[in-house]
Structures are given as structure tokens and as C-alpha cells.
Design a protein with these regions (language model features):
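Solvent-exposed coil/turn segments that connect beta secondary-structure elements
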Residues: 66-68, 90, 115, 127-129
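Charged, amphipathic alpha-helical segments
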Residues: 59-75
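Short, solvent-exposed secondary-structure boundary/capping segments
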Residues: 56, 112-127
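Short, acidic/charged, Gly/Pro-enriched secondary-structure junctions
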Residues: 7-18, 70-112
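Conserved small/polar residues in nucleotide/adenosyl-binding loops
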Residues: 136
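Polar/acidic, low-complexity leader/linker segments enriched in S/T/G and N/D
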Residues: 1-42
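Surface-exposed, interaction-prone regions used to assemble/regulate multi-protein complexes
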Residues: 7, 25, 30, 62, ...
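N-terminal, Lys/Arg-enriched amphipathic/low-complexity engagement segments
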Residues: 33-55, 60
Length: 137
């Protein structure tokens, strides 16, 4: 039987392409992980990738976290400031949990957020969704 382990590293970017806030990872509980020279703090979140109709490419995704003041305020700021979200999914050695290989690197545009009493969902869309098709030559 094969064992697999993955971690998601996430960072928000401003419209000026500058990283902002705290980078987060969702694998090592109450610990920090360093990836590519950047220190990521733990946050309990999940990434949900949606399917899209644009040539088979995904055009939406979401980042889901528990409803707490930090998540709600961060997601509200990300929507208000029109942040982008960088997500790096990395495979881990299943015995040592050290980073092995970059599986995916994605940039998403923050679109909106929804919340209820247990979770807050940050809705993400393709960065290309911000481009008006008529203006593309």
C-alpha cells in the first residue's frame, strides 16, 4: 500500500504584486514550515478546486477555514483589497514529512467570501476572469 502526504502553502498578493500578511501552511499543526526560504505559520484550512468549462481548465476554487475572527477579517480584507492568492501544493516524504516535490503552483483572484457559524469560504476565480474578453486582441 502506498502512502501520500501533501501540504498547501498559501500567500496573499496585492494588486501591486507584493506579498502581504502572514504566509500559511495546512499540514504541521501548531508549527512553522519553511519552504523555498519562506516561513509559513500553521492555519487549519482546506483548498477545494472546482471544475471549469474553459478548455478543461479550472476556473474557480475556494479556500475554506473555520469561522474565527482572524479568518473572517483576513478574508474580508482580501476581498476588499482585491488580493490574489498564491497556492503551492507540495508532496511530502510520507516517513519524514519533509518537502519532496512541487505538485502545483497556482495564482487565483480573490472574488468574494461567505460564512456561517462553522466555516468561512473564500471564493477564488481565475486571474483571467478579470480581463474583459472584448479587450483581448
Amino acid at each position: 500500500m502506498s502512502a501520500y502526504a501533501f501540504v498547501n502553502y498559501v500567500r496573499f498578493k496585492t494588486q501591486a504584486d507584493a506579498y502581504t500578511g502572514t504566509p500559511y501552511q495546512n499540514f504541521s499543526i501548531n508549527e512553522q514550515r519553511v519552504y523555498d526560504g519562506i516561513t509559513y505559520s500553521f492555519a487549519p484550512f482546506a483548498i477545494s478546486s472546482g471544475g471549469g468549462a474553459r478548455g478543461g481548465e479550472r476556473s474557480s476554487a475556494s479556500l475554506v477555514a473555520g469561522t474565527d475572527a482572524i479568518s473572517v477579517n483576513l478574508f474580508a480584507e482580501a476581498v476588499r483589497e482585491r488580493y490574489m492568492l498564491e497556492i503551492k501544493t507540495v508532496s511530502l516524504d510520507p516517513l519524514t514529512f519533509t518537502d519532496e516535490a512541487l505538485v502545483a503552483s497556482e495564482i487565483w483572484r480573490v472574488a468574494s467570501y461567505d460564512m456561517d457559524t462553522t466555516r468561512v469560504v473564500l471564493k477564488l476565480t481565475s486571474p483571467l476572469d478579470a480581463v474583459d474578453r472584448k479587450s483581448v486582441v
